[in-house]
Amino acid sequence: METGNLTWVSDFVFLGLSQTRELQRFLFLMFLFVYITTVMGNILIIITVTSDSQLHTPMYFLLRNLAVLDLCFSSVTAPKMLVDLLSEKKTISYQGCMGQIFFFHFLGGAMVFFLSVMAFDRLIAISRPLRYVTVMNTQLWVGLVVATWVGGFVHSIVQLALMLPLPFCGPNILDNFYCDVPQVLRLACTDTSLLEFLKISNSGLLDVVWFFLLLMSYLFILVMLRSHPGEARRKAASTCTTHIIVVSMIFVPSIYLYARPFTPFPMDKLVSIGHTVMTPMLNPMIYTLRNQDMQAAVRRLGRHRLV
């Protein structure tokens, strides 16, 4: 497509993770295993929480929603990456690239807001244990979950609205395995310094502030636990520790990628793999391995299926 003297690109080319065919095959097998594990682990959480009446509490309904987010988030990048690892030419259309950016930031933004809801849930459970069920009623937690999805949608629309007007007239080589703002922005045929600043403010600083507030919230919760009896304190502390691990796994890579100037660094791809592929797989493992109620529910589900 031509406008004046500019030839607009119709697609982008990924450099991917490796140019060596043998290594690409190995990476395909490894990440196929990771993606299958991600899908099965998160589906297991969704089915377990849905089918086990003992888990029909706000905390586990929130955990189920997190599993849905993890499943969808990994599916934005992993299937395309797997196909490209077996392909000679790794391309994505302009429309596909913008779509990937939209869903990546939609689900990533929803994840950020959703982790705040989970922190709020734990705060109510520990500070007001006798009123927990009353405060965290169905209307409230459903409203909070809907708000997280709406928040992610608004965040993504802002990202996309800033990207769509940009002209892309070449080159079209992306040194990555998926479309994301930092890499695509560098290919625009115009000065993007102001836009880069707006992107860092919209994503990076939001991540930093949100991460700090969440850590302070969990620190406050852990301090409050000192007044609880032994067994209740141990169980609540284990749950909070799990949440802190998950929050750190999600926010630290995101801060690295978006809270700095969009200059490429050698670690970028490795951090992106952890952020987009590994974390969605590890989240269900962390929650099931550290949560005795989830472990018991999974065993009950297994026995029920065998009967």
Curated annotation (Swiss-Prot):
InterPro entries (alphabetical): GPCR_Rhodpsn, GPCR_Rhodpsn_7TM, Olfact_rcpt, Olfactory_Receptors
Keyword Acyltransferase attached: no
Cytoplasmic side: 50-57, 121-139, 220-235, 290-307
SUPFAM superfamilies in UniProt: Family A G protein-coupled receptor-like (SSF81321)
Compartment(s) of residence: Cell membrane
Topology, Extracellular side: 1-25, 80-100, 159-195, 259-269
Residues linked to a glycan: N5
Disulfide bridge map: C97-C189
Membrane-crossing segments per the record: 26-49, 58-79, 101-120, 140-158, 196-219, 236-258, 270-289
Bilayer topology: Multi-pass membrane protein
Entry GO terms, CC: plasma membrane
Tree of life domain: Eukaryota
Keywords assigned by UniProt, alphabetized: Cell membrane, Disulfide bond, G-protein coupled receptor, Glycoprotein, Membrane, Olfaction, Receptor, Sensory transduction, Transducer, Transmembrane, Transmembrane helix
Primary location group: membrane
One Pfam family of this chain: 7tm_4
MF term (GO), any: olfactory receptor activity
PANTHER family: OLFACTORY RECEPTOR (PTHR48002)
Role played: Odorant receptor.
Record family assignment: Belongs to the G-protein coupled receptor 1 family.
Name this protein carries in UniProt: Olfactory receptor 4D2
Originating species: Homo sapiens (Human)
Gene field: OR4D2
